[in-house]
Amino acid sequence: MGFVSLGCPKALVDSEQIITQLRAEGYAISGTYDGADLVVVNTCGFIDEAVQESLDAIGEALTENGKVIVTGCLGAKKDAAGHDIVSSVHPKVLAVTGPHALGEVMQAVHTHLPKPHDPFTDLVPAAGIKLTPKHYAYLKISEGCNHRCSFCIIPSMRGDLVSRPVAEVMLEAENLFKAGVKELLVISQDTSAYGVDVKYRTGFWNGRPLKTRMTELVAALGELAAQYGAWVRLHYVYPYPHVDEIIPLMSQGHVLPYLDVPLQHAHPDVLKRMKRPANAEKTMDRIRAWREICPELTIRSTFIAGFPGETEAEFQTLLDFIAEAELDRVGCFAYSPVEGATANDLPGALPDEVREERRARFMEVAEEVSARRLQRKVGQTLRVLVDEVNQDGGIGRSSADAPEIDGLVYIAPPERHAQRYRAGEFVDVKITGADGHDLWGAV
């Protein structure tokens, strides 16, 4: 690898980070153009003189080597007509990124000068070490949370929201798909807030600008997954207004019609004590609108029963909401004080037996709803990802079922050799039975 670094100390640090990553991945750094298989030019675009110096350096690298990736401030700069300056002057460059774009630069390097994977010398595969079955994986897009829910201490442990660079996220997703992952589960503490901390900064992926924002990321992940015949599933989607933008993507098949939205409660006074959005009526309207746009949508949520000060009337509001909203998958926890949570200081703490009794009543209603909704699937043919095959047949999951937390689809043993299936494969299953949690069917 050849490297040219121009500009201010901030650009120098960017160069150091890129070179560090290159060396960590086994790329050697050449001091000459003719000794390099590829050249990275980190540019400056602050003043006209710096722009010209950067353009000259790019031209020299193209003349002397011919394979050039451009990064830095000039990479993000446009001319009066709105065209990228670098691409307009030097159309032969292989890729262009803006500043502070380690992920985008490395993705371009991997595209144009792949480092061969040698199983005898490389101890870590490109997709990384995973503890899940090889056909599904979790993709964390951010760390931390900006909310201060009174029952939660995650911000004190993990800090405020820090979004991963969008190109870094996309590169990891691509590596996972290449490694055979058939289901990508997008996670974070607050998936909907992705990019808020960087003001939805525009990054680059495959030579195209891509905003650091949930809607744009989900669309790009869906497009990438389609190339590998894979699923994308969204988790921990805080109910911001822009979540409404995701539903059309689900109805169009870009990502699974599955939304994990942690609602926590339905009574406005309880939600206020929780420091959560406090308009259950609006939430119900949104759920109706989502299902109108995407009728096959599965909604999962989690709730807390027995929160400090919760009255029987407030709890009944929650039960009524669950029955009316007909949420497909729910989990409910009896409130438990967590050391450091501000909810511990709220008046009206309920006895353990009351909290547990309310949780049990909640789950009774939720299971009745689940049984009704699952019964409607009998007779349908569902696409199922097989997780396991044994002598009794197969066990898999439909688009409505996330691993570990939702239901399963039990698949009868194949009657013919042509119907045989393996773990990690998709099969079409005719549903023949259902209970309150799981489905049964045959290929």
From Swiss-Prot:
GO cellular component: cytosol
Keyword RNA-binding: no
SUPFAM superfamilies attached to this UniProt entry: Radical SAM enzymes
EC number: 2.8.4.4
Protein's GO biological process: tRNA modification
Main location: cytoplasm
Domain named TRAM: residues: 375-443
Alphabetical UniProt keywords: 4Fe-4S, Cytoplasm, Iron, Iron-sulfur, Metal-binding, S-adenosyl-L-methionine, Transferase
One Pfam family here: UPF0004
One example GO MF annotation: 4 iron, 4 sulfur cluster binding
Cofactor note: Binds 2 [4Fe-4S] clusters. One cluster is coordinated with 3 cysteines and an exchangeable S-adenosyl-L-methionine.
Cell compartments where the protein resides: Cytoplasm
Reaction(s) catalysed (UniProt annotation): L-aspartate(89)-[ribosomal protein uS12]-hydrogen + (sulfur carrier)-SH + AH2 + 2 S-adenosyl-L-methionine = 3-methylsulfanyl-L-aspartate(89)-[ribosomal protein uS12]-hydrogen + (sulfur carrier)-H + 5'-deoxyadenosine + L-methionine + A + S-adenosyl-L-homocysteine + 2 H(+)
Binding-site list for [4Fe-4S] cluster 2: 145, 149, 152
Enzyme class of the recorded protein, top EC level: transferase
Needed co-factor(s): [4Fe-4S] cluster
Domain Radical SAM core: 131-372
Residues at which [4Fe-4S] cluster 1 binds: 8, 44, 73
Gene3D superfamilies the UniProt entry points to: Methylthiotransferase, N-terminal domain, Nucleic acid-binding proteins, tm_1862 like domain
Boundaries of every MTTase N-terminal domain copy: 1-114
Function description: Catalyzes the methylthiolation of an aspartic acid residue of ribosomal protein uS12.
HAMAP family: MTTase_RimO
Record family assignment: Belongs to the methylthiotransferase family. RimO subfamily.
Protein name: Ribosomal protein uS12 methylthiotransferase RimO
Lineage: Bacteria, Pseudomonadati, Pseudomonadota, Betaproteobacteria, Burkholderiales
Gene name per UniProt: rimO
